[in-house]
Amino acid sequence: MKKRDKIVYWVATIWLSLGMVSTGIVQLLQLEEQVQKMSALGYPSYFYTIIGIWKILGVIAILLPKLPLVKEWAYAGFFFLMSGAIFTHLAVADEASEYFGPALLLVLTILSWHFRPANRKIQLSKLEKTA
């Protein structure tokens, strides 16, 4: 792995982790302002708890060594969650500033996934042996 790729991976992964953990904590705390925003988007308040837990568990999966299959699920979850957030903001015609957070986390998800080291990827040879 090139040094540049390793740097891109860790910068993207650290920022992604900070973003997901911080928003996950806010969602678990269900602060009034955030609950109102979520309600305006058409989501029930209990949805916040589910998303907050998923975000924090996803960050743990991405940062822990090994568990490549769980990492793939976490990256997929982050991708679906952030792309869904972007489309939700589009559907309710929110201001452009509302797209920035989800779009940034989506880009960081893609960068972290793309530049992850080989030991954090699923090895196809292992999958083929079990099939």
What do the predicted segments below correspond to?
Residues 1-131:
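Membrane-interface extramembranous regions
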